[in-house]
């Protein structure tokens, strides 16, 4: 059955569902199609020229009880953390598979860090191993990215644990902003590209849960509990705008409108999902301005679909801005203590 036929079949079934659930179901189906359309062959340095000083590191994560693969290109004491999408692979980071990011940042004065893995994780600290797919450990990506890996990188690769940038796309767009909200010294710069910036709102928890289940059988209840759990708002960039404003974080927010340009992405899922995501990005800009935010770049062009060429274009567009912020020496954000993830009164129960 073709993708379009699947969508038509789902739309027919959705006609009997409540409206919010129907939208979520169709959206989740389209989201899974985007992942396929935006995929690529897992080849090292896929679109970067050969001979670059890219290293493949094994960084210990005591919180997850395993080593995490990290692709790394040294370039200076400050680094760009490039976070992957929903279907992150266990062999290479999507930025390496689908873009020439290593080549683009070679001799830029910035190191490049690409953590590998984390499918459907939202780079968050989960409550428990995912129920239903046999996961035998608990995702603790926030701990890894903000404590374990920075200390290891400082000791072994001379990368500072402060004054870095977090750049995320799709699933990880909001994650980048959340990392900056709670860890302002580490991330004075954060960028979201086509990110889901209000995950606790309305039908978004349902949509996210369906998409996670489709991508590896992951259970959103195991991540942040039911949609009423405070962890959803704790990890919601829209809710955490006051932190970003108080920190004076330099933010870069991009979302297309679902119309393809000469960069490509002219397929139903890529167009639909970008259009679906745009509303919350525009609302984020409005709320940010209303909260007194004055340190953001917002790009909502008259084109752009949910696909890698547009995200790479934005990465290159923000590069000079990122260099100016991170290499100027003025990377000290407002002092703030990292807030701990909300804890439930008792372990969240698996969804039924």
From Swiss-Prot:
GO terms for molecular function: diacylglycerol O-acyltransferase activity; trehalose O-mycolyltransferase activity. The keyword Transferase applies. It catalyses: an acyl-CoA + a 1,2-diacyl-sn-glycerol = a triacyl-sn-glycerol + CoA; 2 alpha,alpha'-trehalose 6-mycolate = alpha,alpha'-trehalose 6,6'-bismycolate + alpha,alpha-trehalose. Its main location: secreted. Residues 333-352 have a biased composition (Low complexity). Residues 1-37 form the signal peptide. Its EC number is 2.3.1.122, 2.3.1.20. InterPro entries: AB_hydrolase_fold, Esterase-like, Mycobacterial_A85_antigen. Residues 102-112 are annotated as: Fibronectin-binding. It is found in: Secreted. Homodimer. Belongs to the mycobacterial A85 antigen family. This is Diacylglycerol acyltransferase/mycolyltransferase Ag85C. It comes from Mycobacterium avium. The lineage of its organism: Bacteria, Bacillati, Actinomycetota, Actinomycetes, Mycobacteriales.
